[in-house]
Amino acid sequence: MEHADQYSWIIPFVPLPIPILIGMGLLLFPTATKRLLLFPTATKNLRRMWAFPNILLLSIVMIFSLDLSIQQINGSSIYQYVWSWTINNDFSFEFGYFIDSLTSIMSILITTVGIFVLIYSDNYMSHDEGYLRFFAYMSLFNTSMLGLVTSCNLIQIYIFWELVGMCSYLLIGFWFTRPAAANACQKAFVTNRIGDFGLLLGILGFYWITGSFEFQDLFEIFNNLIYNNEVHFLFVTLCASLLFAGAVAKSAQFPLHVWLPDAMEGPTPISALIHAATMVAAGIFLVARLFPLFIVIPYIMNLISLIGIITVLLGATLALAQNDIKRGLAYSTMSQLGYMMLALGMGSYRAALFHLITHAYSKALLFLASGSIIHSMEAIVGYSPEKSQNMVFMGGLRKHVPVTQIAFLVGTLSLCGIPPLACFWSKDEILSDSWLYSPIFAIIAWSTAGLTAFYMFRIYLLTFEGHLNVHFQKYSGKKSSSFYSIKLWGKEEQKIINRNFRLFPLLTLTMNNNEQPYTIGGKKEARITITNFGYKKAFSYPHESDNTMLFPMLILLLFTLFVGAIAIPFNQEGMHLDILSKLLTPSINLLHQNSNDFEDSYQFFKNATFSVSIACFGIFTAFLLYKPFYSSVQNLNLLNSFVKRGPKRILLDKMIYLIYDWSYNRGYIDMFYSISLTKGIRGLAELTHFFDRRVIDGITNGVGITSFFVGESVKYLGGSRISFYLLLYLVYVFIFLVISYFILF
């Protein structure tokens, strides 16, 4: 493809025919679709035929994106082409495409992850009545994201930005008949509207400043205005903050992060796509695309890094006590996105994009593996997310789903930062750069790396080690037919927040006659013992997923193993470069402008040793607390060996319980928003309604009623004689003239 840049405009439009054709078919032939349900096997095969062209078209885009990346690595310059849509004397609105290293990186990321998710979804969603609708939404999602990354101006970005938000709304609420899913998609939509409104205001503000929406013109004009001090700096900072607000909402940064855990109500494949390469990546992409704009405003760079470090720590602490496997991974995504924002705020453009790449493949692997786990658990507990996604009911899955276990373990180790897996290289680069930026931020970032290792191995141990805990909850297995249709995924129950959450969620609290209780905070607590191991009953067990679901996981496993190699230096003409650096050259990087091979190698090994040590400490702590020591022993009292009562131990327990209550209840942030914002807005609406009905309507109705009674009084007073009416008329005219005379003269 010698001149592939010239045909890059087709990238967003290649997958577009699929949602159009599926949508037309569902609208024009709804009756035929319902009749096909009478023939389940034929219907399933017919529907799955749509998966092949979907995957094929996205594969074409992937090949095209790879060619663009190769051209960028070989030194191709930025390519832009625009078509004028609206031309006026003072205004010209243009559409086009913009090809640079960032575009090629994002295109490869979207297409590769998208292809694997589509292959996986073919089997995962095969028994769902909404199979075709799901694939239509997924294709539209990929199209919207590809359009976003190839946009050449802010208006075009905003259009595709809204399309990405709409697709996420449709996919999060895919099972819209479930109240939890319907509420989750509304929450995501409303939360993102806040950021989108800020983004729109920021776009209009910068157009008012520069008179252009085009990226290259915008950057050049704005830099000249800043250099010549021809613009009000406070107004510029406000507009840049509004632009950043869009990225905060889309990438689930504090304080607009609350939609991300609830987004797990959607099907697991879409969770993988949202968290790896589409919606949450859009916010990082926006900041990276507008990086030349933000970099000349120091206050905005400080704000970006501050929001990033807060999100890093908050996401990690909220993941500590989650029992839902997908929500635990969701908070993990939030924390890792915080690392990317932190890197961008520090000026480490390369490290941020590198972590975006490595995290995408690792997190896609983890979500697809969690989907395989959920799929296997549904055969036992039924189609209920409260059970199939709850790690309390899992355990011991290592021997039942060995391939999934290996995939999940590799993804977990990568996210923990264990070499030579993908996330080790990118996270270590961010951690190293943090020392150059701020020691306080560095301490928080390094400490959170240990927390990441802890909560990720907590998820792994609760899921795969020990015994299958659902058996001790006395759930019987459920057989499923060869074809079944899922409309309502279980009945919705009211969620009760457990305010007495404890460190060991899988253990039961019992009291034997010969045991003495211990006291914490004035409350008597029972000692922890393991029970129910004597329960004898035959159960069904989880089974490994089909090859269609395992194949994408294995390919993503290979990506997780080897994608970090793009940052390994190679020698070219006496210069030590790597593929990522050649791809991003001459992108801006404030840090590491001068390098020395020996010093860099020494610093790398020193930082790597420190980061791996912190990760290993987190893993060891997770093993200490969650490794099932009771696997071969019945009714073992853990407190006899683990707990030695004393003042220091009681204080430590209080701190642990406080942290876990904070984490389990999402830091009480959702509760705060519910009380302060939701109830406050509803109270204001009720007050406005009362004022409108009682005051505004009261005045209007009062005037009408008063006029009515005055008219009735005059009517009866006059006795229905015309002469009396004429007299009153003349009196009123005289009074009016007298008043007018005194007013005028």
From Swiss-Prot:
Transmembrane segments: 9-29, 50-70, 99-119, 135-155, 157-177, 194-214, 229-249, 268-288, 290-310, 337-357, 364-384, 406-426, 435-455, 550-570, 610-630, 724-744
Entry-linked InterPro entries: NADH_UbQ_OxRdtase_chlpt_su5_C, NADHpl_OxRdtase_5_subgr, ND/Mrp_TM, NU5C-like, Proton_antipo_N
Keyword tags: Chloroplast, Membrane, NAD, NADP, Plastid, Plastoquinone, Quinone, Thylakoid, Translocase, Transmembrane, Transmembrane helix, Transport
EC number(s) recorded for this UniProt protein: 7.1.1.-
Molecular function terms, GO-annotated: NADH dehydrogenase (ubiquinone) activity; quinone binding
Gene3D superfamilies, A to Z: 1.20.5.2700
The protein's name in its UniProt record: NAD(P)H-quinone oxidoreductase subunit 5, chloroplastic
